[in-house]
Every structure is written in C-alpha cells, then in structure tokens.
Amino acid sequence: MANFDILEDLKWRGAINQETDEEGLRDYLAKHDDLALYCGTDPTGDSLHIGHLIPFMILKRFQLAGYKPVIVIGGGTGSIGDPSGRSTERVLQSEETIKHNEEALTAQMVKLFGTENFRIVNNRDWLGKMNLLEFLRDYGKLFQVNNMLNKEVVASRLKNGISFTEFSYQILQAIDFYILNRDHGVQMQIGGADQWGNITAGIDLIHRLEGADRPAFGLTIPLMLKADGTKFGKSAGGAVWLDPEKTSPYEFYQFWINQDDRDVIKYLKYFTFLKHEEIDALEEKVKTEPWKREAQKRLAEEVTKFVHGEEGLKEAQTVTEALFSGNVKDLTTKQVEIALAKAPSAESGEEKKNLVDFLVDTKIESSKRQAREDVNNGAIYVNGDRIQDTDFEVDPAAAFDGKFVIIRKGKKKYTLVHIKG
C-alpha cells in the first residue's frame, strides 16, 4: 500500500472533480493505514444502473488498495428524497417498496464488494430513531439557513419551489457523515459532483461537534459525459441496469463493446482495474488499428466480469459470437430470447410450411418472387443453416423447444419468429 499512490492513480484516471483537503488527506494516508470511506445510495429503485456505478468504482479502488469501504443504504434519507440533480419534487415511496429496494441494493453491493474488509449500514438505524425535537435542538441550530440557500442544489430549485422535506435533505446527509465519523471511524465521503454541498456540510458538522482537527475529507467525481456531449449511462433502449433481469449480461456486454473510439479509453480508466501500461497500449491500438476494436473488447470483458462474474461474461461472449458467426443453433432457448429481444419479430403456426410461403407469411419477404430469389442466392438462413432449396419445409418443432424459428437474411438481419399454438 505504501508504494501505491491512490490519489495519483485517481488523477491519472480523471476521476477527481473536487477534494476538500488534499494535503490533509495525503498526510493522513502517510501516517495511517486505517482510512475508512463511504458512499451512499438511496433505495429509490431495486437496481443500480451504470451511471450509479461511477462513485462505487472509486470506492472499490480504495478497497483494492487496502482501505475500508462502507456503503450507506439510505433507508432513512430515501423516505424523503434527495433534490440533487432534480428540477421537480420526488414522489415519496411506500415503506414496503423502500424495504424491498434496500434488500435488492444490498445484494448488488455484496456481489460487487464481497464480504471481506467491507461494511454496509443503513441510515434508517440512526435517523429513524431521532425525534423532531432532537433533530432541531442537536443539529438544526448548527445550520444557517442563508448558507443552505446558497448551496447549488437548493438555489437551483428556489424559482420553482422546494419543499421543507427536500430542503432538509442536506442536514440529514450531514448527520450521516457525522454519525459514521463518530461511531464507525469513517473519515471520508465520496460522491458525484452534485453532492459537493452535502459533503462539505457533513465535514462542517463534524468539525463543529468533534473539533476542527478531526480528520474528515470529501472527494467528488466529475460528471461523466460522452464525446458527443450527452450524459453517460443510457443506451438507445434506456438505462443499462446491473440487475441481469433488467439488462441481460449480453445486452450489458454489447453496451460496452459498442462504445465510441473517442470514449473508450476514458471508460477503461474509470470502469476497469487494468494497469496504466495496458490502458496506454490499448490507447495506441485505438490510434493505429481502430478497426480491431481491441480496447472496446477489453472494456466489455472487464466490466461485464466485474458486474456479472465469469459466468455472465461467458454467456455474453457465447451469444455475441453466435450472432456474429451466424451459428445460432447451439444457443439455448433462453439465450435466443435474450440475444434477439430487440430484433424484428413475427408469428407463425405450429404446422410445417414451405420456406417461400413461410418467408412471405411472416413478412420477412415482400413477395414469393423475391423470396425465391433470396433463397436461390444463398441469402436465407433457418436456425443458422443456409437454405438454398425453395422446396425446403420449415419445421417449427425442430429447434429451441418449438418456441422459435430464427431467420437470418443476409449477414446480420435477424428475425425471431414466435411459434403460436
């Protein structure tokens, strides 16, 4: 650990937006090996998406460097709602929904961080026990309203209005940092760029209650933008989730492998644990042999393995290779559903049918003449096999549990035909 400068590594990766006291943090790291740091997430949903993943990658880097990560599940703050990054009030969730989301997020975090040298806590455990008078007497007196109004997250909402509930959020997050510092030995908070005001409020509270020399540090990460200026984290189909039931490992892998050459090195620095030398070599490959897309393949491999494990990566690569080569016959029925979930689809009955009629009836071909021409020219594949016989009969029961027939026209145009009884 002494030979690894975590802060210099983060700077090289472009992962630091602001720090509260770099000199003080460096001094602390030089003298102590017990730094504990945290990042929080409110249970507003039952899965993180890749945009949420960014600060947790920083936390993971500290864990790999030997430090102690703590994750705060915001069971308390989540019942109120963080105004950061929003122009409108959040819709409050039911207690049942919040608890379900807490359990799901906890499971995801354990998958990413393991169980060694890692803790998960829930701020419901302290915020839920605090009554109104305690809140006002012990903490409310320490916050100046004029300072709170100047925080960007609040100031940006004043024109259209912000409820007292969301206005109070920064106090609750500050209390989180104070409690973690006092009772759990946590010295540092990590968050997105929009969390700067909340983080500094927590540090101020710690210094007021525990003394100005109490170690407390904050670090925010930059807003992640793509080369075209749009916000990172969305695909054409919406958010890219960590939950494999929401975004399959194949879709997850495809998101990363399809990244722009202009973005791929930045993402390798942010989302992988590859050494500087390997990333530098991949950057050179992007410049000299971009058509090989080696950087994208490495990115997709590393992030998919981190989130979905070796098994998820293997499935993603199996499906990708099958679609690329056209050899789909070895895919399972489940893999077919995943791989062609967004492909054009059609329906057909259970009976055997002449291929030409099948192509026209499912509207894959516009006419029998065109269908015969494409079959004769070798442009039609049925379940991975090239068919050049216009008298060929399609047997829906022949593959994929009788649920599908996969038609490929040309090199990449797939249609998934659902068989209806």
UniProtKB/Swiss-Prot annotation:
Which sites bind ATP? 234
* Motif placement: 'HIGH' region: 43-52
What's this protein's name?
Tyrosine--tRNA ligase
Give the location of motif 'KMSKS' region in residue numbers: 231-235
Q: Name one GO molecular function term.
A: ATP binding
Query: Where can this protein be found?
Result: Cytoplasm
Q: Which InterPro entries match?
A: aa-tRNA-synth_I_CS, aa-tRNA-synth_Ic, Rossmann-like_a/b/a_fold, S4_RNA-bd_sf, SYY-like_C, Tyr-tRNA-ligase, Tyr-tRNA-ligase_bac-type, Tyr-tRNA-ligase_bac_1
Please give the CDD domains that the UniProt record associates with this protein. Answer: S4, TyrRS_core
Listed PROSITE patterns: AA_TRNA_LIGASE_I, S4
Source organism per entry reads Lactobacillus delbrueckii subsp. bulgaricus (strain ATCC BAA-365 / Lb-18)
Key words of the record: Aminoacyl-tRNA synthetase, ATP-binding, Cytoplasm, Ligase, Nucleotide-binding, Protein biosynthesis, RNA-binding
Q: Where does this protein hold L-tyrosine?
A: 38, 169, 173
Q: Which residues form the S4 RNA-binding domain?
A: 353-419
E.C. numbers = 6.1.1.1
- List this protein's GO terms for biological process: tyrosyl-tRNA aminoacylation
Per the record's keyword annotation, is Transmembrane included, yes or no?
Answer: no
